[in-house]
Amino acid sequence: MSKRDYYEVLGVGRDSSERDIKKAYKRLAMKFHPDRNPGDKAAEASFKEIKEAYEILTDGDKKAAYDQFGHAGVDPNRGGGGHGGGDFGDIFGDVFGDIFGGGRRGGQRQAARGSDLRYNLELSLEEAVRGLTKELRIPTLAACDLCDGSGAKKGTSASSCGTCHGQGQVQMRQGFFAVQQACPTCHGRGKIIKDPCGKCYGEGRVEKSKTLSVKIPAGVDTGDRIRLAGEGEAGEFGAPAGDLYVQVSVREHGIFTRDGNNLYCEVPISFSKAALGGEIEVPTLDGKVSLKIPTETQTGRMFRLRGKGVKSVRSHAIGDLLCKVVMETPVNLSEQQKELLREFEASLTGAGASKKHSPKAEGFFDGVKKFFQDLNS
């Protein structure tokens, strides 16, 4: 009797993610689980078919072989020479691994460590500079609390696999070669679960969300990563959990930009303040401070406020705040103000006035004049 397509069994498309496949499996496994359908042979057969499809489609190598060769690519009974099936990567890996001492001799496959998780955390500049403790809600796979992660129904335990006799591997012939492969019955574990847990359906893990209090150190920046050991997904059947990596990104700020441990900002000043000098207030992350502006300050001049930047997350060094003053042209002038400016402009004209009061402009226009003279000569 021909087998149904594994994707059809689970009701998923060929481009479905592993997460979608897991969701489909859990929904169907709950529906057809023998504990929910006692004595129903059809439900039991459906459950076995669903479990088989799930095991193939969540194993990267087996899924690739199935996608390429169909059921023949994952049929453990198709071995002897020819291209009829089998996982060729595993076959040749075993052959050459044995020759060069690599191989997978020595018993059953160890239960897999849990997957690492990544959490993207966005912070304001103030939060990144000062540090804080954040409550993070993490969706993950946790050890099943009903079976304590064993996958077996409460009161039972996994039994030794009858196919490989607990070794996790079987010997198969490939033409002239006898090679070792992971046991197709227990998938290399050496044990099988005859009575799966009714909560995790033999997986030993369940989907769960947990809340963690994570301390974010002062001075972090976009691209920094914080590792929380053992806070990733639970491992298979009691294996160690993976790690959680918190990936930091810092939002753009309305006033400051950051470069390493230094902060930068632009501060507008009036024409009169730039010419006559005086004190202005500039913002810092700790509040406003006074900045003395010398007379005849030109727009674009940079002022450094030492120690007003960011404390390094990796040392005790503290950056600076660099303020660039930008002269702002007055707008919405009254007629009286315009007249005063005209009088002021007139006071700057005359022989030598431009050179005295605007040396850069004088030099610029002299250069322009010379440029056109050279062009026409």
Swiss-Prot record:
Localization per Swiss-Prot or TrEMBL: Cytoplasm
Alphabetical list of InterPro entries matching this protein: DnaJ, DnaJ_C, DnaJ_domain, DnaJ_domain_CS, HSP40/DnaJ_pept-bd, HSP_DnaJ_Cys-rich_dom, HSP_DnaJ_Cys-rich_dom_sf, J_dom_sf
A cellular component term, taken from the record's GO annotations: cytoplasm
Positions of CXXCXGXG motif repeats: 144-151, 161-168, 183-190, 197-204
Residues annotated as binding Zn(2+) 1: 144, 147, 197, 200
Coiled coil segments of this chain: none
ZnF start-end (CR-type): 131-209
Cofactor note as given: Binds 2 Zn(2+) ions per monomer.
Domain remarks in the Swiss-Prot or TrEMBL record: The J domain is necessary and sufficient to stimulate DnaK ATPase activity. Zinc center 1 plays an important role in the autonomous, DnaK-independent chaperone activity of DnaJ. Zinc center 2 is essential for interaction with DnaK and for DnaJ activity.
Identification of the protein by name: Chaperone protein DnaJ
Gene that encodes the chain: dnaJ
